[in-house]
């Protein structure tokens, strides 16, 4: 859980991150020529600097904070909140300040991590007393999102923002570089950005962790295969494993989806469950039961009192299912449909018992993240883990 320190050069800011932001806007406008995006302001939700790490002539902090700190003065004219507010470290204070500063502004677009942005927008609704966001910001039309999968949050955003003119675009802007943009709103895949100062290589996930894995150059990748992404950049990274797993959906042009994290998976019994499986399973269970998931995490139970093994899921709902058992059954069924390894281990309950679903109390994950000093910014709830460390902490708080 320690911070990672990634070099961010001025050239990298200009030729990678800001260029990616410009291209995201350009692609959106190309797809929506009647857009009035520039009639109002952009609410950009970022992280903060970390003054405890500062040394002479250097600034350490979340990438999003560094981007705000160094943003072009012209772009700064159309951005809210003010810089002092944007860089506040205390997320609860920042959330309240942002809501109060922006409620009376003409916001046309928002950018940030879906989970933390939802928290800010919820505060806006509380302070305004309105039912839907377009009652506060009637001209809102776009959410540029990234950092975590949008699927678990989509329904909540659609309920919060009823406007038929609302659009969503996924971006892949990591601390290490700006890697992808969703250039086609009808396709969830992102276009790999080849000219942002990065060189891409991939390690097949079935070889990841070996001493000498195969490293595939970009021109050698295959579609529908899970890879760990390896990058070298003009900012100083050399064959760096960024920690995300991707699957290419096309190689002409190169388009991909993020399927998970190299450390966030469950393979305690050979089931090879990845985050993409989890997202699909939860989406299906929500569809079947009318539920909405806010946060979740899962880990294996290696052996219970009866000598049985299973997966244990801790789920916080923004809208609870009518029947929790049916939700768990639907999730388990869908995981077997999309993951043959999981299906094999679940066969006749020989290796894996049906999954156990535990309902989290409201606000549990936010309280846990706050306790760990990980509230807001670019911090993410770990979704899947072979270790029970995180889920045990959460279960203790959930009593």
Map each language-model feature to its residues.
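Residues forming well-ordered secondary-structure scaffolds
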Residues: 12, 16-20, 37, 93, ...
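Conserved AMP-binding loop of ANL adenylate-forming enzymes
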Residues: 21-73, 85
